[in-house]
Design a protein with these regions (language model features):
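Exposed, low-structure sequence patches enriched in small/polar residues
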Residues: 1-344
């Protein structure tokens, strides 16, 4: 009787089953760290969870004791009369927040072929909040990074002096700026200039100062669209989790199953790894920013004083760091334990 392992349909089903079960492990790590410094807090600290009874409520509150607070706690403390509301208090409240997501997965679609996928997204935000003034004037700064794919330009030549070091991707980026500027400006179609500006109450008119073609609101989305696979038509400076893309490393160790390799080598490993990180080196908020809605707003033009459309973020640098480590590598161990390594 023919063994089951020799039947074609059985081998096919084995291969299909292996592909369906190729995910060997998945790991997800999420860290959300928040801290607050609140000068001018007046109530005394009690013995039970740090609480004391003040008028109408315990202070600083069980939400504070168990770390379940956010920036809105400053409004709560002010409304309860816990803060020293005096212009002589020059030290603002400060908050620091870090969000870090790490996703890892190991795949083995066929025997001896292992693929490690990893994706991460990290954002840090620091705020300085002048709670003693009306409107809680706030300044903000931070950093941002996430994994992406930028293979479209990875193998593009750098050109030469004869063609002015021409880059097709850079040309695509430059040509897209006008289109992105128009799309950003279209978001202000029904906007009204905010109070406290020279044009307060009037409908937005680009003739008074439109979106800057070379501002970060335009150039960063155009840059991501041209150089990465996550850009698309989005206008986000800080891409969301939905646009997170993985990097990877690949290792194949099955060549020693072949007779010639098995006779000469103890092990033969073929390696490949790819890494691409989009990063906002640092950003800060404009001191003259006035919000219109959903993060859109206006800043004062340094020359005319007119309000011009802008997000609140003044971004100094963005970058995409891409590397193959290696593009192709071979690790060899001979029968006499001599090792050799080739990488490109």
């Amino acid at each position: 009787k023919e063994p089951l392992e020799d039947k074609g349909w059985y081998r096919t089903m084995q291969s299909v089953a292996r592909v369906m079960m190729m995910v060997r492990s998945v790991g997800i790590s999420y860290r959300n760290q928040y801290s607050m410094s609140l000068p001018g807090f007046m109530p005394m600290i009690g013995d039970a969870f740090g609480q004391t009874r003040s008028v109408g409520a315990m202070s600083p509150g069980l939400d504070f004791a168990f770390g379940m607070i956010g920036d809105s706690y400053i409004d709560k403390a002010r409304d309860n009369g816990w803060l020293l509301m005096n212009d002589s208090v020059a030290t603002p409240a400060t908050t620091n927040k870090t969000e870090d997501l790490q996703i890892r997965a190991t795949l083995e679609p066929i025997k001896n072929l292992k693929i490690d996928l990893n994706a991460n997204r990290t954002m840090t935000t620091a705020k300085s909040i002048q709670y003693m003034y009306e409107g809680n004037p706030t300044t903000q700064s931070g950093t941002f990074s996430m994994t992406t794919l930028s293979l479209g330009s990875a193998f593009e030549g750098s050109g030469n002096a004869g063609n002015g070091y021409h880059s097709a991707t850079f040309e695509k980026f430059c040509k897209s700026l006008d289109g992105f500027r128009q799309r950003v400006e279209a978001r202000y179609a029904n906007a009204v200039y905010p109070e406290g500006t020279l044009l307060a109450g009037k409908k937005f008119d680009p003739a008074n100062g439109g979106v800057n073609k070379y501002g970060s609101d335009v150039m960063i989305p155009a840059f991501l669209s041209a150089y990465t696979s996550m850009g698309g038509s989005s206008l986000d400076i800080f891409p969301s989790l939905a646009r997170l893309l993985p990097n990877w490393s690949v290792r194949y160790s099955g060549l020693t199953r072949l007779p010639w390799f098995r006779d000469v080598f103890k092990s033969v490993n073929i390696n490949h790894a790819y890494k691409s990180i989009y990063a906002v080196g640092s950003y800060s908020s404009y001191s003259t920013f006035m919000e219109y809605m959903n993060g859109l707003g206006f800043v004062s033009d340094a020359t005319t004083g007119n309000p011009i459309p802008s997000s609140m973020y003044n971004v100094s640098t963005v970058s995409i760091n891409e590397s193959f480590s290696p593009l192709l590598g071979i690790d060899l161990t001979f029968e006499n334990n001599l090792t050799a390594k080739l990488e490109y």
